[in-house]
Amino acid sequence: KALEKTTMVAGEEVVPEKEAKDEKTVANGYFKDADVKDRELSDYTGEWQSVYPLLKDGILDEVFDYKAKLNKDMTAAEYKDYYTTGYKTDIDTINIKDNTIDFVVNGEHHQYTYKYVGYKILNYEKGNRGVRFNFETDDAGAGRFKYIQFSDHGIAPSKAEHFHIFFGGESQEKLYNEMHNWPTFYPASLSEHEIAQEMMAH
């Protein structure tokens, strides 16, 4: 019920919010190269939950309905398909502390120590850009978690409110090509409805 209320209230503000999404802001991917700064793993410190289970359980259907009405570029079903591909992951939670990242998959912990290795600015087809902040571990047993990239719509040091993560065992360069699957994590302290509300405001 609370979620339905939020959707209705937000719906009254469709026009100004649509304008806001078109603004050339940093969050929307418009910035100067000189404004991009290196970031520490501490920007991502905390306990994070995957939003993929929420999508599978139908919790985010209200979000897709809202996006379809707001943007009028895809149907709610098309949005759900797009985000199903984007959010898909077998990682349940990610815990980040100091220089370590602990990936929890089906109750099993995969924890490694990481170092920052720089950032990459990516140009997107629609004219905006994004920044991936790259980390890697020297642990020989890290497998698919050797190379890590964070994207949280920020370009300089600041605490992430949520993030998309890219990972693999081959190279950072290979991960730059991944544009369709971006597992997404929100603070573990947020409820399902709080996450849905954050998404509608995003």
Role assignments for model-derived ranges:
Residues 3-35, 96-202:
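Calycin-type beta-barrel ligand-binding domains and close structural analogs
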Residues 61-115:
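N-terminal glycine/threonine-rich, aromatic-flanked beta-hairpin/loop signature
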Residues 45, 52-59, 86-87:
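Sec/Tat-exported extracytoplasmic proteins
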Residues 40, 75, 191-192:
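Helix N-cap and loop-to-helix transition residues
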Residues 31-47:
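N-terminal helix-cap/turn-to-beta initiation motif at the start of protein domains
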Residues 42, 47-53, 93-96:
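Beta-strand cores of secreted/periplasmic/IMS beta-sandwich domains, seen most often
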Residues 49-56, 100, 106:
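Generic short beta-strand segments
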